[in-house]
Amino acid sequence: MTNSNRIKLTWISFLSYALTGALVIVTGMVMGNIADYFHLPVSSMSNTFTFLNAGILISIFLNAWLMEIVPLKTQLRFGFILMVLAVAGLMFSHSLALFSAAMFVLGLVSGITMSIGTFLITQLYEGRQRGSRLLFTDSFFSMAGMIFPMVAAFLLARSIEWYWVYACIGLVYLAIFILTFGCEFPALGKHAQHSQAPVAKEKWGIGVLFLAVAALCYILGQLGFISWVPEYAKGLGMSLNDAGALVSDFWMSYMFGMWAFSFILRFFDLQRILTVLAGMAAVLMYLFITGTQAHMPWFILTLGFFSSAIYTSIITLGSQQTKVASPKLVNFILTCGTIGTMLTFVVTGPIVAHSGPQAALLTANGLYAVVFVMCFALGFVSRHRQHSAPATH
C-alpha cells in the first residue's frame, strides 16, 4: 500500500468519527428549536432522536457482515447519496414521520461510516501505533463535539433554521466522499485473499462482561449528561450561547485530554489508571451538578479532560483479554457502547418529563459510578497483564 493511500484511508477514519460525533452531540443544541418547529414539548421531541441512535446501532451491528459482502468504497459512496437525501428530507418536510425517517437514515449512514473507520485503523496500524491512532481517531469525535455546537449556536442566534446545522454536518461526509476517489480499500470476505491460517478461538472471560457493562453505562451516562446540559443551563438563567459554550468546553478539553493521555497511558497499568479516571469523572460530574453557576465551566472542563481516555481504554482493555486481539470481541464492546447511545433519550426523556433536566444529570452521574465499580471489579479478573507483557497499553 502506498503512503498517500494510507493517509487518505486514515483521514476517512478521522472524518467518520467526526461525522458521528457531530450528529450525536449537536442534538442537545437543536432539540429545543426542533420541538418549537413541530410544536411539541422538548421531552417528547427527544424520543424521536432515538431513531438516530437506533440507526447507528443497527448499522454497526450489521456492518460486521455487510463489510464482507459490499466493498467499503461502494458503502461510503452509497452513504453519501443517502446523506444528501436525508438532509433534503429535513429541509423540505414538515412531517414528524419523515423527520424520524431522515434521522434513522442519518444514523445508518454514520454508523456504517464509523464502523468502516474503526476497521481501517485496525487494518492499517499495529502494536503501539494502533492504540495511539485509535485514540487520535476518537479525538475527532470530540473535535466535532466542540466545533458543531458553536456552529449551531451561531446559526440559531441569527434565526437561521435548525436544519442548516445538519447541512453543515453533511459537508463532513462530502469530504469523505471526495477522499474515496483514487483510493484503494482493504478487501474483505469473498473479495479478500485467503492465505492466512485460521486463528485458534479463545474464551473471553468474565472481564469482557464487566467491560461491556462499563462501555454501555459510560456512553449512556456521557450522552445523557451532555444532551441535557444546555436545557439545564438555560433553566438556571444562562443564555443559549453560554449553554452552548459549556458543551463546547467539555468536548474541547475532552479532545485535549485524548491527545495528552495517548502519551500518559503508556506509563501506567491501564486497568488501574482507568479505575482512577472513572472515579474522578464521577466526582467531577457530581460537583458540576451541585456546584454554583460560576464554577460550572471549570468543573465541565476538568470532567472533559479526565473522562477523555475512559471509553478508548475500555476498548483497548477488551482487546487485551485474549492473547490474539479479537475483532468480534472489540465489536461486542463497541456494540454495547452504541446500545448506550440508542438508550440515551429512551432513559432520560421520561426522567426529564417527570423531574426535569437535573434529574437526568444525576442519573448520568449514577451511571458513571457504575463504570467505576465495573473498572474496580475488573482488577480482580483482567487478563491484560499476562497478555500484554511485552506490548504497550
UniProtKB/Swiss-Prot annotation:
Membrane protein topology class: Multi-pass membrane protein
GO CC, alphabetical: plasma membrane
Keyword Chaperone annotated: no
Keywords: Cell inner membrane, Cell membrane, Membrane, Transmembrane, Transmembrane helix
Keyword Metal-binding: no
Localisation per UniProt entry: Cell inner membrane
Positions of transmembrane segments: 11-31, 51-71, 78-98, 101-121, 134-154, 162-182, 206-226, 245-265, 273-293, 298-318, 332-352, 361-381
Broad class of the protein's primary localization: membrane
Origin: domain of life: Bacteria
GO molecular function, one term: transmembrane transporter activity
Cross-referenced NCBIfam families: PRK03699.1
Entry's family note: Belongs to the major facilitator superfamily. TsgA family.
PANTHER family with a match to the protein in the record: L-FUCOSE-PROTON SYMPORTER, PROTEIN TSGA
Record protein name field: Protein TsgA
Lineage: Bacteria, Pseudomonadati, Pseudomonadota, Gammaproteobacteria, Enterobacterales
